[in-house]
């Protein structure tokens, strides 16, 4: 039987994971670079690889978990890491598309500019699956699958393309898709966490202090 993290153990794990580290920033930059190339070359396989590498999911999960257990420290850490990662991602992707000799908008780029209700449903389902998968102590393929399904990397890179080419529609359309993904993954995490705790908010809060 697979062991799961308790609420307290999972909170401590997130405390440890949610820091702006050079190592994680380097990994993020590599993931953004790979995703940008994939979008530029219209290569789905390359984009999927970048999504598996990206650490963008962690602060969103941390934010949802922090809100679910009313933990201001975790909320602050998650926001700091997420904002830093978004800024780094925009910078790297903008620089890439600014120097790239391929300036045309591929179908992979265009697909990230018009969010639909399906994106909302995917983010919700992915967020719920992520809550379950991230609580397991043993390695599993749930969290990587969520990273692919919810596709956080491509919209950020597409926003970088919009900045590099002065295309407002690409910039705001992609940022809107990224925001939708973040918000609904976070909301699914809040609901999923409360369900998994199986206790009243008050007793759960006391248990964590």
Regions found by a protein language model. Give the residues of each.
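Alpha-helical transmembrane segments and their membrane-interface boundaries
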Residues: 1-121, 136
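Alpha-helical scaffold segments in soluble metabolic enzymes
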Residues: 13, 36, 94, 128, ...
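Juxtamembrane transmembrane-helix termini
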Residues: 41, 100-103, 164, 194-200
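Transmembrane alpha-helical segments of integral membrane proteins
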Residues: 63-64, 157-160, 190-198
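Cytoplasmic membrane-interface regions of multi-pass membrane proteins
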Residues: 67, 72-73, 138, 195-203
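Juxtamembrane/interface motifs at transmembrane-helix termini
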Residues: 67-70, 80, 95-98, 164-165, ...
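Hydrophobic alpha-helical segments
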Residues: 113-186, 190
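Cytosolic-side transmembrane helix boundary signature
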Residues: 186-209
């Amino acid at each position: 039987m697979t062991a799961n993290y308790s609420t307290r153990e999972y909170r401590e794990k997130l405390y440890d994971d949610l820091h702006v580290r050079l190592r994680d920033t380097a990994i993020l930059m590599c993931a953004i670079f790979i995703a940008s190339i994939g979008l530029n070359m219209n290569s789905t396989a390359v984009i999927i690889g970048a999504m598996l590498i990206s650490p963008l999911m962690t602060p969103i999960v941390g934010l949802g978990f922090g809100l679910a257990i009313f933990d201001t420290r975790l909320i602050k850490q998650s926001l700091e890491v997420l904002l830093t990662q978004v800024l780094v991602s925009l910078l790297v992707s903008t620089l890439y598309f600014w120097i790239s000799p391929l300036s045309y908008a591929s179908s992979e780029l265009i697909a990230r500019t018009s969010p639909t209700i399906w994106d909302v449903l995917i983010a919700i389902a992915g967020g719920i699956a992520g809550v379950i998968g991230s609580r397991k102590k043993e390695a599993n393929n749930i969290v990587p699958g969520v990273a692919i399904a919810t596709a956080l990397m491509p919209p950020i890179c597409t926003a970088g393309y919009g900045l590099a080419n002065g295309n407002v529609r690409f910039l705001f359309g992609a940022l809107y898709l990224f925001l939708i993904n973040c918000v609904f993954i976070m909301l699914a995490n809040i609901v999923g966490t409360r369900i998994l705790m199986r206790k009243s908010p008050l007793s759960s809060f006391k248990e964590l202090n």
